[in-house]
């Protein structure tokens, strides 16, 4: 059952989908981590794949940049393809001095300057939080694999090139761990349609120091984040 943005047949997606922003990262995850991965959609070059990880059927699909883009894909996956869990695996920027480039952040919540969730929630503030069980499973996966991961709030920004640089001071004061562009939207879509969601991000650049990773590194590595996401699915299955 194709949608305007996904041309996969019914049953093409697993009940759990990992979602990076970059479709080429989706391709990398499928080719590197999944067995017997098959491409199931390619509309607008937003690639999606389904395969298995340690025998568990899992899908991966890009969601693009920003809340409007990721909201479209998340909504269609949930309502048209029966997806129950979405794990965003993406990059973020750091503002706190104690957060370093390549750190992994498990986003238990996501603040935002976007008005999209207010439109959804009748002009009220929606508390965009991750699913607790998925968050707990990710923390357990990180510990089991010996991967250091921080847990806390992300900030989902509408503008990549923001003119309000003073807002970074406010974010630091409030303990924001990473700045990205999608988590708050994905959390709200999941809540609206009865699914579950979690965002796991790797710090790709530091807004204060200027340190950054290359675009190639962002596309082809960040394996710790992906490992946590995949292992958390297996842990979650055992807990259910």
From Swiss-Prot:
Record field: catalytic activity: a purine D-ribonucleoside + phosphate = a purine nucleobase + alpha-D-ribose 1-phosphate; a purine 2'-deoxy-D-ribonucleoside + phosphate = a purine nucleobase + 2-deoxy-alpha-D-ribose 1-phosphate
Alphabetical UniProt keywords: Glycosyltransferase, Transferase
EC number: 2.4.2.1
Binding site for phosphate: 21, 25, 44, 88-91
Domain of life assignment: Bacteria
Family: Belongs to the PNP/UDP phosphorylase family.
Function noted in UniProt: Catalyzes the reversible phosphorolytic breakdown of the N-glycosidic bond in the beta-(deoxy)ribonucleoside molecules, with the formation of the corresponding free purine bases and pentose-1-phosphate.
Protein name: Purine nucleoside phosphorylase DeoD-type
Organism: Actinobacillus pleuropneumoniae serotype 5b (strain L20)
Native organism taxonomy: Bacteria, Pseudomonadati, Pseudomonadota, Gammaproteobacteria, Pasteurellales
Gene: deoD
């Amino acid at each position: 059952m194709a949608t305007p943005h996904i041309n996969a047949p019914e049953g093409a997606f697993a009940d759990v989908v990992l979602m990076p922003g970059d479709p080429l990262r989706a391709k990398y995850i499928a080719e590197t981590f999944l067995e017997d991965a098959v491409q199931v959609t390619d509309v607008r070059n937003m690639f999606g794949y389904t395969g298995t990880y340690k025998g568990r059927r899992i899908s991966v699909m890009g969601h693009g940049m920003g809340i409007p883009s990721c909201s479209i894909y998340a909504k269609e996956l949930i309502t048209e393809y029966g997806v129950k869990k979405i794990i965003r695996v993406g990059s973020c920027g750091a503002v706190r001095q104690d957060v370093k480039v390549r750190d992994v952040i498990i986003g238990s919540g996501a603040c935002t300057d976007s008005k999209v969730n207010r439109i959804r929630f009748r002009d009220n503030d929606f508390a965009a939080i991750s699913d607790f069980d998925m968050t707990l499973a990710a923390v357990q996966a990180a510990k089991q694999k010996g991967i250091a991961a921080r847990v806390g709030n992300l900030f989902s920004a509408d503008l990549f090139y923001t003119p309000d640089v003073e807002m970074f001071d406010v974010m630091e004061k409030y303990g924001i761990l990473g700045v990205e562009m999608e988590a708050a939207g994905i959390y709200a879509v999941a809540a609206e349609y009865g699914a579950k969601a979690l965002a796991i991000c790797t710090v790709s650049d530091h807004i204060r120091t200027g340190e950054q990773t290359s675009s190639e590194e962002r596309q082809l590595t960040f394996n710790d984040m992906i490992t946590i996401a995949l292992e958390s699915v297996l842990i979650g299955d055992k807990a259910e």
